[in-house]
């Protein structure tokens, strides 16, 4: 869910997820669409399948561990984990000018 995703992003990047990524670029946030503005925005672009059910995870030794017996929920958790790690790995591309990018200007 968005709650777990937000926690993962905070843990991986140290950034406030809503403030830093809630409207970042063309693809981060609820109305995300269009060509990614940079590598950070591309992380959100590939993360379009993860919003459905709530799942649980733990934070052990600075690593996200998805611990579900339900394979569907584990897959959702792994998807959120992947975007959180992608955002951390691309912190160097984070550009404040895209923080509140207007989605209508994004091209499909």
From Swiss-Prot:
UniProt cross-references to Pfam families, sorted A to Z: Phospholip_A2_1
GO molecular function: calcium ion binding; calcium-dependent phospholipase A2 activity; phospholipid binding; toxin activity
UniProt-annotated site: Important residue of the cationic membrane-docking site (MDoS), residues: 96, 99
InterPro entries assigned: PLipase_A2, PLipase_A2_Asp_AS, PLipase_A2_dom, PLipase_A2_dom_sf, PLipase_A2_His_AS
Domain of life: Eukaryota
Tissue specificity remark: Expressed by the venom gland.
Ranges where the record places region Important for membrane-damaging activities in eukaryotes and bacteria: 96-108
Disulphide-bridged cysteine pairs: 26-106, 28-44, 43-86, 50-79, 66-77
GO BP term, pick one: lipid catabolic process
Assembly behavior: Probable homodimer; non-covalently-linked. A model of myotoxic mechanism has been proposed: an apo Lys49-PLA2 is activated by the entrance of a hydrophobic molecule (e.g. fatty acid) at the hydrophobic channel of the protein leading to a reorientation of a monomer. This reorientation causes a transition between 'inactive' to 'active' states, causing alignment of C-terminal and membrane-docking sites (MDoS) side-by-side and putting the membrane-disruption sites (MDiS) in the same plane, exposed to solvent and in a symmetric position for both monomers.
Function in brief: Snake venom phospholipase A2 (PLA2) that lacks enzymatic inactivity, but induces myotoxicity. Also causes an inflammatory activity that is demonstrated by mice paw edema induction and pro-inflammatory cytokine IL-1 (but not TNF-alpha) elevation. Also shows antimicrobial activity against Gram-positive and Gram-negative bacteria.
Protein name: Basic phospholipase A2 homolog BnuTX-I
């Amino acid at each position: 869910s968005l709650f777990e995703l937000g926690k993962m992003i905070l843990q991986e990047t140290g950034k406030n997820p809503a403030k830093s990524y809630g409207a970042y670029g063309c693809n981060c946030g609820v109305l995300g669409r269009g060509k990614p503005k940079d590598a950070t925005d591309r992380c959100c672009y590939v993360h379009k399948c993860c919003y459905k059910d709530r799942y649980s995870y733990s934070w052990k030794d600075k690593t996200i561990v998805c611990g579900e017996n339900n394979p569907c929920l584990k897959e959702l958790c792994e998807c959120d984990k992947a975007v959180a790690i992608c955002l951390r790995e691309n912190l160097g591309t984070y550009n404040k000018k895209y923080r509140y990018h207007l989605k209508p200007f994004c091209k499909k």
